[in-house]
Amino acid sequence: MMPGSKPGKKRGVLFDVDGTLIDSSYFHALAWWQAFRREGLDIQISAIHRCVGMGGDKLIEHLVPGCTKDIQEDLKSAHGAVFSTFWPSLRPFDSARDLLAACSGAGLAVGLASSAQERDLDVARRLLDAGTSIDAWTSSNDAEESKPAPDILLACLDKLGLSPADVVFVGDAVWDVLAAGAIGVPAIALTCGGISEAELREAGAAEVYDNPRHLLENLGSSAIGKLGA
């Protein structure tokens, strides 16, 4: 639908994109690792991966406390440049498109609550090829503060014309779960981004599934199924 449209549906599902619908979390970790190396910073890639899902500014501050603004901008620019070289390797997770279609077919508004850069989100949307199943989407341009702050979820809700009480959020990172919890939105977490079920549940996930296909197979009994009931 988009841009800027409100579909008039009374309930909806918000989806994170990277690591949730698109198999990209480890590519992001590698892109950040290379960006840090370019600045002479030796950051363990496992530590980087655990921060993927945060906004770039918060990821850098978490891994390199006290990093200057200039270096932070250089790191973000380098990450974007390196990540773009991985675009041809990106793939949607199995059944990601079908999951979006099933939610839309159940009469739910579907929003991509992504804080990705606009050009990265364009690539992801083309890969998903979900057409009219998606009612609204966001990018990093739509939020003042990045995850785990809930700004991007609130921006997506605004585009859908819904409130936090009307939706469920699906993500793959601890930061997704925390962002949802900050505004009282139930979070369904997927482990396909590389974070364990235990960590996601500890962060507050209401339900945990392996990947989009696993969630789709259990959609009727999930929090999403209850929304559409």
Walk through the language-model features, giving the residues of each.
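Asp-based, Mg2+/Mn2+-dependent phosphohydrolase catalytic module
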Residues: 1-11, 104, 117-229
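Short, flexible loop segments at the rims of nucleotide/cofactor-binding pockets, characterized by
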Residues: 86-90, 115, 186-187
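Residue-level marker of regulatory loop/turn positions in helix-turn-helix DNA-binding domains and
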Residues: 92, 113, 145
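N-terminal helical cap/lid subdomain that shapes the substrate entry/recognition surface
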Residues: 6-106, 122, 130-131
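Conserved phosphate-coupling serine/threonine residues in phosphotransfer and NTP-handling enzymes
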Residues: 20, 114-116
